[in-house]
Structures are given as structure tokens and as C-alpha cells.
């Protein structure tokens, strides 16, 4: 039995679907009040609970061999949820999940972090991800840390202030640093693979097949839509200040500024080899943008 924590999320649901398609028994920890119908339809066993409720995590882990943790509270915080904070859910809550998994005799723990998590930008999400990676490094379970690059569907989309339809793109810093933007579905395929393959690596860092900068992506958007994009640049110094000022007041926004700054500071060091090794044919950033432009027509 695999337990997925975060199975109602964008990445998490894709992982659950793939695990079920491959015939695996899957349980999901779902927060009280969240719609579980999409999970029940595909034969998932649903246990209600929350990362901030340790007793629910103990019940969820009973009889489980592998835990896959994709959950993060950042999306709900951005949507206005006052509690829990990133510290409470992504850091303390994840530590409780690791404790519960160990106590239940779970053999493997797959955790979704991100590439560049060690860049020391000092955001709440970075602290939570690093603390969880460190907690897992002390565990006797077989642990797999998955570190994908920025997702195409988030950072090359309106949500990530890359709005081809409205012709508006925000860039932190110069925007010339190349990134291997990766498709969420390709990340899901890799997370699924390392959850079930016989001998998974301890850390897997990867991105999509094509490295392009945000400025190059913006030029591509102009060519594809035949419309001029209004590109708004925010200096790195302002992003650093925003991270510091928002740290306590708005942990999600501070972390979003951190993600943008990371994309400008951190030249992507990884490629799509871990995907190809597993037979996954990844979508390039260019193909993703071409498809988005086609949908806009
Ligand atoms: N976006 C990127 O570019 C990027 C890059 C690298 C890594 N990542 C990582 O990839 C993962 C993204 O996953 P996703 O797309 O599935 O995120 P998502 O769509 O925001 O979903 C978050 C999931 O976490 C669950 N959750 C939130 N708070 C919880 C709590 N207190 N207890 C239990 N579950 C809780 C949510 O449940 P509800 O549905 O009930 O809210 C939902 O299932 C994250 O770990 C993120 O840090 C993202």
C-alpha cells in the first residue's frame, strides 16, 4: 500500500492516477472538507486528516510500505487561508509525517522538494523543504528526495505572472538565466517511478529537455502570439527586500518572490536525463508554450 499525502493537488493527483493505472493500492490523506470524489472514482482509499494533526498521520500510515509526500500549504496560503502557516504545515507537519511513517514501519519515503533549495535565499518554503530533507537524511527508511526545476504550468503561466493571453510577463532581475522548465506531468511520471522502482536514488534532481531564460520565453511568446508582451522587470534588490519584509507577514508571497529570484540567480545545473532513463519523453518549454499559444487562438 502506498500513501500519498497531497493527492488532491495538481502534481499529487497526477501521481495518484499513474500509481493506480499501474495497478498499485493507494491511500490518500485528505483534509476534512476537501472533495475526495476524484480519488474515490479511481479506487483510492481515503483517510481524512491533516499534516498539522499528528494522530491522523499515525492512522494514515498504518499498513503502508511507501509514503509519497507532495503536499504543500503554499497554494492555500496564497488563496488567503490564515492557518496553518508554511512553517506549521510544510515543516512541523512534514516532520510529524516522517515520525508517523517511521513508527508504522514504512520502508520508503519519497519527498518532493525543489532544485536550488540550497541557494540560501531565506524563504519560509526553503526553510521547510531543507528541514524536511535534513529530517529524512537522519531516517533509517529508504528516502528519495525529488528536486524538480520550476514547473512549466506554474511559472510559464498566468499563475506565475507569465500571461501570454493578457500580454503581461513579470521578470525578477535580468531574466537571462537559463532554466530547464519541466512539465508537471513529467514530474508526476518520475515521482511515480521512484516510488515503485527497485533501487531508487537517494536524491534525484532534474528538469525539462530545453534550457531557456525567462526573456527567451517572453520573446517566444511574442513570436507565437504575434503580440507584443509587456515585460515588467523587478530588480533583484527589491525581491530580496520583499522576502525579508514579507517573511513573517505573508510567508507564501515571500516564498514566491524567492522562487522568482532563484530563477534569476541559479543557472540550472540539471537536465532531463533522470526522466529519459525511466522512459519518460519530457515536454520542452518551447513545446509547452506552442501548445498554450494554440489554445489561445
Ligand atoms: N511549482 C513548482 O514550480 C514546483 C517546483 C518544484 C517543486 N514543487 C513542489 O511540488 C509540489 C507541488 O504539488 P502540487 O502541484 O500537487 O501542489 P498543490 O496543487 O498546491 O496541492 C497541494 C496539496 O497539499 C495538500 N495540503 C495542503 N495543506 C495540507 C495539510 N495541512 N495537510 C495535508 N495536506 C495538505 C492540499 O490539500 P487540499 O486540496 O485539501 O488543499 C493538496 O492536496 C510541492 O511540494 C511543491 O513544493 C513545485
Language model features by range: what are they?
Residues 2-24:
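N-terminal Rossmann NAD(P)H-binding glycine-rich loop of SDR-like oxidoreductase domains
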Residues 30-103, 118:
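NAD(P)H-binding glycine-rich loop region in Rossmannoid oxidoreductase-like domains
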Residues 73-165:
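Glycine-/Pro-rich loop/turn segments that contact NAD(P) or position catalytic residues
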Residues 154-162, 194-204, 227:
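Glycine/proline-rich active-site loop of Rossmann-fold NAD(P)-dependent oxidoreductases
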Residues 172-177, 204-211, 222-226, 234, ...:
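Glycine-rich Rossmann NAD(P)(H)-binding loop
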Residues 173-195, 202:
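Substrate-positioning beta->alpha
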Residues 219-266:
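Terminal hydrophobic/aromatic helix or amphipathic segment near a protein terminus
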Residues 270-297:
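Amphipathic terminal alpha-helices
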Amino acid at each position: 500500500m502506498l500513501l500519498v499525502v497531497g493527492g488532491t493537488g495538481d502534481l499529487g493527483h497526477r501521481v495518484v492516477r499513474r500509481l493506480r493505472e499501474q495497478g498499485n493500492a493507494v491511500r490518500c490523506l485528505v483534509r476534512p472538507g476537501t472533495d475526495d470524489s476524484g480519488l474515490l472514482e479511481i479506487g483510492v482509499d481515503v483517510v481524512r486528516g491533516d499534516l498539522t494533526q499528528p494522530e491522523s498521520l499515525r492512522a494514515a500510515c498504518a499498513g503502508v510500505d511507501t509514503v509519497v509526500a507532495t503536499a504543500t500549504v503554499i497554494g492555500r496560503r496564497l488563496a488567503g487561508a490564515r492557518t496553518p502557516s508554511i512553517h506549521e504545515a510544510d515543516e512541523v507537519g512534514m516532520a510529524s509525517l516522517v515520525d508517523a511513517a517511521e513508527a508504522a514501519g514504512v520502508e520508503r519515503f519519497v519527498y518532493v522538494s525543489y532544485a536550488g533549495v540550497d541557494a540560501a535565499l531565506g524563504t519560509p518554503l526553503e526553510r521547510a523543504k531543507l528541514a524536511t530533507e535534513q529530517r529524512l537524511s537522519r531516517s533509517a527508511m529508504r528516502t528519495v528526495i525529488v528536486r524538480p526545476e520550476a514547473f512549466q504550468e506554474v511559472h510559464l503561466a498566468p499563475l506565475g505572472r507569465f500571461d501570454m493571453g493578457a500580454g503581461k510577463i513579470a521578470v525578477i532581475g535580468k531574466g537571462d538565466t537559463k532554466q530547464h522548465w519541466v512539465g508537471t506531468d513529467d514530474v508526476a511520471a518520475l515521482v511515480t517511478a521512484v516510488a515503485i522502482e527497485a533501487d531508487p536514488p537517494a536524491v534525484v534532481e532534474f528538469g525539462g529537455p530545453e534550457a531557456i531564460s525567462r526573456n527567451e520565453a517572453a520573446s517566444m511568446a511574442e513570436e507565437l502570439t504575434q503580440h507584443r508582451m509587456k515585460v515588467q522587470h523587478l530588480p533583484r534588490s527589491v525581491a530580496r527586500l520583499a522576502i525579508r519584509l514579507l517573511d513573517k507577514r505573508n510567508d507564501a508571497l515571500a516564498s514566491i518572490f524567492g522562487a522568482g529570484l532563484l530563477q534569476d540567480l541559479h543557472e540550472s545545473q540539471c537536465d532531463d536525463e533522470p526522466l529519459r532513463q525511466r522512459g519518460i519523453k519530457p515536454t520542452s518549454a518551447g513545446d509547452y508554450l506552442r501548445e498554450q499559444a494554440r489554445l489561445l487562438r
